[in-house]
Amino acid sequence: MGTFFRVCLALLACWLGYGPARAETRVALVIGNGAYANKAVLPNPTNDAEDVAAALRRSNFEVILGTNLGQSQMQEVAIRFARAAAKADVAMFYYSGHAMQHNGVNYLMPVDARLDDEADLKRFTRVDDIVSDLQQAKNLRILVLDSCRDNPLAEDLKRSGRTRSGSVGRGLSKMEAPLGTIISFSTQAGRT
């Protein structure tokens, strides 16, 4: 597990008062996508997700863990998470894998992703939708994106000529955190 994760988990443990003393309801969705069908495999996301899930369980989170999820599986766990977040005091979302921005909107990539044109983005998970799901938690909402942002599918889309010039940007777009929400990126917005 990299330094970024260790720092995030240490801060999270301090913030939440590590251990069983608190009676808060805590839920987390942890996704690690690395076994991409159409591009090179990323070796770390699955291990990172499992490490984060274990640390969150030690902090009394109910964890929904998904690794190497396709489109339908990502939708299923996101719906399950939204329902759990609505009943939680604290909700956290952690993602490791490919992500990209298009027209200022951030997307998470399922392992069965194809990106032949802009219409295919409907099959990706919008980060804004996850943030909306997080907002249902009563007290604290945490979004951690440790994504590989040098997205090879975005390059395919640019080369295909089936997108407007400049609509696929570097890295992820900057996000404003709603009140009571912590958003953490592994790099600055717009960087890979």
What are these regions (language model features)?
Residues 29-61, 80:
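N-terminal targeting signals for Sec/Tat export/insertion, comprising classic cleavable signal peptides
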Residues 24-26, 61, 138-140, 179-181:
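Short glycine-/polar-rich loops that comprise or flank the Walker A/P-loop
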Residues 45, 49-50, 56, 66, ...:
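Active-site-proximal C-terminal subdomain of hydrolase catalytic domains
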Residues 25, 69-96, 100-158:
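Caspase-like (clan CD) cysteine peptidase catalytic core
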Residues 6-17:
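Bacterial N-terminal signal peptides
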Residues 18-23:
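Sec/Tat signal peptide C-region and signal peptidase I cleavage site
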Residues 35-43, 62-68, 115-121, 192:
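Second-shell loop/turn segments in exported
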Residues 1-3:
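N-terminal secretory signal peptides that target proteins for export/translocation
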